[in-house]
């Protein structure tokens, strides 16, 4: 049996309180406090790495920055970010407690982030050998609090030689990282479905559905590019078809892509067939934090504006909101993968009722999602001038992992492999993809 640890964060006023404990060991607990200027400093560093617009940036400018100039564009920049996040967000005693639990098999670390820390890629964090001078950190924290409000602390990092402050060991190398399903969702009335009961049933594959009225190169256009039987993804799904039945029933794998019939009625009909798992690859829209409701997060299927739902139409298309999914009580399978822009953003809201919560409330016990927008195949190739397709790689990796007995272990193993490729100089193993993946589990599901 592996050791289980739980890392929790809670925003209370201007501070974020953290605790780390070992399940079954009352004495194995560490607590610490993150002051608002420190949290803001961490978020500012992360924002510079993400392909989401910052300030007046356009989507295109944000993607260009993230792929070519941001911290995730080079191994040195990514390691520096990983070190800064590790030094700011996890206390030295907490790092020590995690290190003390390292064994074979790896411990499992369940993380419940606060709203402020909802998009932190926890597995990426690097173990610091040393951190900022404590007195300088206190001074920077105090200077960040002004009559006009609180700003990000301006910390004087000593980063001329990154190897002197971290050996590059990551949290994902110390433990298998899982996000805990928010308590209000995990304890809500629902009818869960277990993997062992459904594992032999067909997999439901919703792959890059065609959003009505959207050109292939538009913001809601194709994620994977022009369908072809010669692509790595088509070959992967072709091999899957040869081994087992899938939904929808198709004669060739290429027929899974860019379907025009994949609307909410089609989805509901196929979910009634009790599939073993659901893979969705496409577009999602995160709920607007200013709006205040996580259930406004949406999936973009092939639904026209005539479809029933609570979302406002986008041209001739009506998005499928998380609230629509919950209201319809669609029977979700035990495992769900939502490889879509920021689909794992539930924790950004006090009431974590986003897309992940919707799937759990509808029956799922394990949901894999993303923390931020994944660059499309076309976007990646445009700005890197490379022929590789990391979007296809992540889809294949998640699809294979969700077929395994222990999906959590398989996904963490793949992320470690990608991180080590990146660390060893393989520029095609971009952290914009592997670091974005998070898996939510309820009831000890693996």
Task: Describe each PLM feature range.
Residues 120, 214-216, 287-291, 345-349, ...:
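Extracytoplasmic/secreted cell-surface and envelope-processing proteins
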């Amino acid at each position: 049996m592996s050791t289980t640890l739980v890392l929790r964060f809670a925003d209370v006023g201007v501070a974020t309180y953290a605790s780390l404990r070992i399940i079954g060991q009352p004495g194995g607990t560490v607590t610490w406090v993150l002051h608002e200027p420190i949290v803001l400093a961490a978020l500012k560093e992360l924002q510079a790495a993400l392909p989401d617009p910052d300030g007046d940036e356009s989507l295109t400018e944000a993607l260009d920055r993230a792929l070519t100039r941001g911290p995730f564009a080079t191994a040195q920049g990514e390691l520096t970010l990983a070190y800064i996040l590790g030094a700011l967000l996890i206390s030295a005693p907490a790092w020590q407690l995690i290190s003390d639990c390292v064994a074979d098999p790896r411990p499992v670390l369940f993380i419940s982030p606060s709203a402020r820390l909802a998009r932190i890629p926890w597995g990426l964090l690097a173990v610091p050998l040393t951190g900022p001078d404590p007195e300088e950190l206190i001074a920077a924290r105090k200077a960040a609090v002004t009559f006009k409000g609180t700003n990000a602390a301006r910390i004087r990092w000593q980063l001329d030689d990154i190897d002197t402050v971290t050996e590059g060991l990551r949290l994902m190398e110390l433990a298998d990282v899982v996000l805990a399903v928010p308590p209000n969702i995990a304890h809500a009335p629902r009818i869960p479905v277990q993997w062992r009961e459904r594992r032999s049933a067909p997999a439901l594959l919703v792959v890059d559905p065609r959003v009505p009225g959207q050109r292939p190169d538009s913001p809601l256009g194709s994620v994977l590019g022009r369908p072809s039987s010669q692509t790595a993804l088509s070959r992967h799904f072709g091999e899957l078809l040869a081994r087992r039945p899938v939904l929808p029933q198709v004669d060739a794998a290429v027929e899974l892509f860019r379907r025009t019939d994949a609307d909410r009625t089609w989805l509901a009909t196929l979910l009634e067939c009790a599939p073993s798992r659901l893979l969705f690859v496409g577009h999602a829209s995160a709920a607007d934090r200013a709006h205040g409701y996580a259930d406004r997060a949406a999936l973009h299927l092939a639904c026209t504006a005539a479809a029933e739902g609570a979302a406002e139409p986008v041209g001739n298309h009506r998005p499928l909101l998380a609230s629509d999914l919950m209201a319809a009580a669609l029977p979700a399978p035990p495992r769900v993968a939502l490889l879509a822009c920021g689909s794992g953003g539930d924790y950004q809201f006090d009431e974590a009722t986003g897309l992940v919560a919707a799937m759990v409330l509808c029956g799922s016990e394990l949901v894999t999602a993303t923390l931020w927008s994944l660059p499309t195949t076309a976007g990646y190739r445009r700005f890197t001038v490379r022929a590789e397709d990391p979007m296809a790689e992540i889809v294949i990796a998640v699809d294979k992992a969700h077929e395994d007995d222990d999906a959590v272990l398989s996904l963490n193993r793949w992320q470690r492999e990608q991180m080590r490729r990146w660390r060893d100089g393989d520029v095609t193993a971009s952290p914009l993809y592997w670091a974005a993946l998070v898996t939510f589990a309820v009831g000890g599901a693996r």
